Structure formats: C-alpha cells, structure tokens
Amino acid sequence: MVQKVFSLIMIISLTFAGENRSDDLAYQLVLEKINKKVVPTSYIDEIFNNPSIEKHLEIPERFAKPYEKKSWEQYKKLFIKESRIVAGVKFYSENKDLVFQVSKKYDVDPFIILSIAGIESNYGRHYKGFTVFNSLYTQIHEMPKRAKWASNELASYLEYCYKDNVDPQSIEGSYAGAFGFGQFIPSSFNRYSVDFDDDGVRRPHDWPDVLGSIANYLVKNGYNPGSKNYAEGGDIWKSVWAYNHSDNYVMAVLGLAEKIRERSSYLHSDVENRLKYVIENFNPLNNRSVSELQRTLNANGYELEVDGRLGEKTINALRDAQSKKD
C-alpha cells in the first residue's frame, strides 16, 4: 500500500513538473532554439526541473543603471584609478611570461589584453553575482525586450554546459549573464574561447585560456595582428568596441592599457639608485620626483597613492624596499 501511494505521488509530481515546464517561457524558447543534435531534450528537461532555478528581481534594476550610461569622467574614475593600475602592474609582473606568450601567438598588444582583463573582472577579483542560468532566466521572464536575446544566450550556455559536463547552476557571472575572468557571454564563449594551455578544456577561470580567448576575440573582430593603430575608428578601436559596444569602454581600455604600460617600465627598478638619483637631481624633492618614486614602489608591489607627497606611507615603503634589498 505504501509503495502504491509513493508511486502515485511520483506520477503526480512528474505530471505537475511537465505542466510547469510547458508553461515556462524560458523552457519553450530554449527548446525552440537549442541544437537538439548537440543537446538532447532529456537534458533540457532535467535542467529546467532544478530547484535552484529562481528569478532575481534586482537584475532589471541593475540594467536600468549600466556603467555605459555614465559620463566619461565618471567612467574614467571607476576604471582608470590607481588601485586598478597597481593591480594591473602586479598581475603583469606575476604573469609576464604568459602574457607575452599570448601576445606573441596572436600578435596583439599585451597591455590591451591586460587592460580588458582588468576592466572586466579586476584580474579575477570581481566577476560574479548571480548564476549564469538564473541571470538569463530572469531576463527572459522579467524583461520582455531582452527575452529573445537572453533565450539565445541560455541555449548557447546549455550547449556549453552539456558538451563540457558542467552543472549549469555552478557558474556565477554578471547580472547580464557574462561569466569568467574575461566576462564572455555564452555565445561569445562558444565562438571565441580557446584552450590556450592545451589541457583539453576551455576554462573561463584559468588565466592561460582567459588571456588567449581575449586575444583571439580581438583578432576575430578586426584587430590586425601587429597593428599600432590606436586611433578612434581604427582596427584596434573597433575590435575593443566589439567586446563592449561603448565608446567609454574603448577609451577606458586604451587609457588603462597605457597607464599599465607606462608604470610597468618601473618594474624591478633599483629603488636605492632611483632614490639616490632623485636626491642628487631634485633638491629639494618636488612633487614630480616623489611621484616617480611612488610609481616605482607601486610597480614593485606596494600600494601607494601617487600624490607627490613624501608622507609616512611612502617613507615606510622605501624603508621596507631597502631592507629587502639589504
């Protein structure tokens, strides 16, 4: 008797689940758009029965306040600031060989690649907030104007998850549905991501694959290998614009790249000799010379505000650098 009751409950549960799926706009749209030669319907049914599926009502609110609608001055303060420049130089210092391997293979400016990684995820520090599935699911149900786009992306995402045996609820990304340290949307990930380290898997959170994928994206979207044309409307500008359709974004990428390039010239500088040079050539010390010292220290792992003032933090950093040298 107990077994019969249990069986009846299971039948009722499955029936309601089927009815819920048939009433689920996201399920219907994905079923229409997904390549069933690649992904079986049974897999889609299983995924849409996951109890972790939910709609996040704060996502439409986030879309109402995108970074790209900010003025250039506001945008610049967000993305070309001292902390991000320092983080970029530090990342470059720690991953220099990898950066140049990627740059050499694709013949793309290494500092453009670094800059995009910095703006997209602050070098892996900021890249998630919602599961990719739930973000796209929410857009389909709560944002009618984005339903078509989001359903295409959700179909692409499930194709990736099925092929690579990834739990669709296991990857978190942005409110828009981009994921990984390079913040690719699913269709772009499927199209442009590469297995740069040849381990057999394209990994959105492993730096070899991330940097390689960014470089590949740029080249596939108009970056002429070896180009030095950074002018507005040139091939580099257009390829970065393809990554994010915003002039502010392009200017931020180019601006941050130049700051990291400039600051990286101080890497591994001899702090003792530079201090000696400044003291001998600038008496008394002026803002320009102290700023140069602060940049040198930042390039070697310190985090100072470049304000041209020889304050306590700068002096302590100099002492620490000197003690390490001794």
Each predicted region: which residue ranges?
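Hydrophobic (often cysteine-bearing) scaffold residues that line and stabilize catalytic clefts
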Residues: 23, 95, 314
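Catalytic glycan-binding domains that act on GlcNAc-containing polysaccharides
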Residues: 38-285, 307-309
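Short acidic, glycine/serine/threonine-rich helix-capping segments at coil-helix boundaries
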Residues: 282-290, 295-326
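Generic structural marker for isolated residues within well-ordered, non-membrane alpha-helices
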Residues: 30-31, 99, 185, 294
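Sec-dependent N-terminal signal peptides
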Residues: 4-14
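Cleaved targeting-peptide boundary
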Residues: 18-26
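Alpha-helix N-cap/N′ positions at the starts of helices
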Residues: 25-26, 94, 288-292
